[in-house]
From Swiss-Prot:
Oligomeric form and interacting partners: (Microbial infection) Interacts with Chandipura virus matrix protein.
The protein's name: ATP-binding cassette sub-family E member 1
Lineage summary: Eukaryota, Metazoa, Chordata, Craniata, Vertebrata
Other comment: The ABC transporter domains seem not to be functional.
Binding residue positions for ATP 1: G110, T111, N112, G113, I114, G115, K116, S117
Annotated residues for binding of ATP 2: G379, E380, N381, G382, T383, G384, K385, T386
A GO MF label: GTPase activity
Cellular component, GO annotation: cytoplasm; cytosol; cytosolic ribosome; membrane; mitochondrial matrix; mitochondrion
Location of Phosphothreonine modifications: T550
Gene Ontology biological process terms in this record: negative regulation of endoribonuclease activity; regulation of translation; rescue of stalled ribosome; ribosome disassembly; translational initiation; translational termination
Amino acid sequence: MADKLTRIAIVNHDKCKPKKCRQECKKSCPVVRMGKLCIEVTPQSKIAWISETLCIGCGICIKKCPFGALSIVNLPSNLEKETTHRYCANAFKLHRLPIPRPGEVLGLVGTNGIGKSTALKILAGKQKPNLGKYDDPPDWQEILTYFRGSELQNYFTKILEDDLKAIIKPQYVDQIPKAAKGTVGSILDRKDETKTQAIVCQQLDLTHLKERNVEDLSGGELQRFACAVVCIQKADIFMFDEPSSYLDVKQRLKAAITIRSLINPDRYIIVVEHDLSVLDYLSDFICCLYGVPSAYGVVTMPFSVREGINIFLDGYVPTENLRFRDASLVFKVAETANEEEVKKMCMYKYPGMKKKMGEFELAIVAGEFTDSEIMVMLGENGTGKTTFIRMLAGRLKPDEGGEVPVLNVSYKPQKISPKSTGSVRQLLHEKIRDAYTHPQFVTDVMKPLQIENIIDQEVQTLSGGELQRVALALCLGKPADVYLIDEPSAYLDSEQRLMAARVVKRFILHAKKTAFVVEHDFIMATYLADRVIVFDGVPSKNTVANSPQTLLAGMNKFLSQLEITFRRDPNNYRPRINKLNSIKDVEQKKSGNYFFLDD
């Protein structure tokens, strides 16, 4: 019985429908044929049940199931013990827990569906860990005995005795208006227990929003409001689930500084974040999570910030001698053509233009772009990046200035609201029939974005990240001269972001087209950009879109507005933010090098 639990069977509750099939899984299972009850299911049962002790991992039932509801995952051999929580039979399980330390910020990094939010719930005391015994959950005494000798024992004892108060900033801020009613100011006044409301509001730019109703706030405003509500309450454990989605680069750093200002020798702070440069800036130490999404997740020991993120990118945990991803993710900045060479390939020009919308005025400096090139637009929210994209697409007419060249345009908007009823396959078939079966497109776009896994689901039931990937595939599948992509990384986890960036880059090179991308995730922006367009001015009053610059010049200009400096990690070249007023930071500001390309 040495290998009694070396695999784990997952039955998808949504897809398994015993009433509609002939129980192929049970009929084809060799163990059942030998007369053992490995798979139990009848046409009357709600869902199939698979015994993990009897299963031999042959994988026949997976292939036979007409709905694709089963998956059987072989576990690394050291995962029989240390189960922290399992939801029910044949469902997700989490191994170990991240270890928070008082007075420091713990960052969690890992893909979606790998148990970060479960870990947060358990550490907040909102979910009682059942140590894998889902049929008879243990009581707290047993749980404490189980964790004895680790820092978690003290932590859980404190939660039980001292009633440590935990607050979680939820992941999906767009759901907040359904729960919270009233103006921003009134809610903040109600929650303000530490009397720091004025300072926090100033840091997060919320002072001018106090009269607004919560349901009228945009995504970024809701995010800042949610962070503020958490920061002004009295608590011992602060948890932030993705505090940077919807925010632009400047606001991300402000949010990070606000979260770091909560540090106190007897407070625990835990952050889940997919933007690696923000995570780097925020955390004092990091736990990685690896495993198979929605099957099992494993938490590593805490590492230092740099080491933790590099381990996540390398896909290899040295302390456990375990590889959890085939390829490591490396950031080589693209070799950009010299300024002289670019001139020869010049294809398209756009004129200087002006556009006034209500109070807001945008001036665009004339520029030109070539094919096989990705332009990244850098600027805060409300500096007219989306307006510029819509003018290029011909959706908005300029008030003064020349005509925009008529181009075929494919546009992926920032907010994706699915209107279509039906499955993803039908949608792809309607919109991009030629592309989605084309072998080149399948290898370049469909496979890396993992559209296959969700192709038969209803479009209305997809999660944010799944919708984002479908939208990206639809956008790239439409034949066009120029692809306009607005925030391709929203809702995606760190690994999918890098995949998406790679997809866009490879597709643009192969198809010899141009792409304009709006992106706030710094790592993604540097990875994508051949040239950058910097937007400056006063947000939502009057702003200027400069003509395209090289990556180095543009980044220096943009970062000098934000007053941040970057260095490069020597191992995998990812950009890292320098801590404010550190030696490096002061040096680079003096010499005016805000951004480095050299290796």
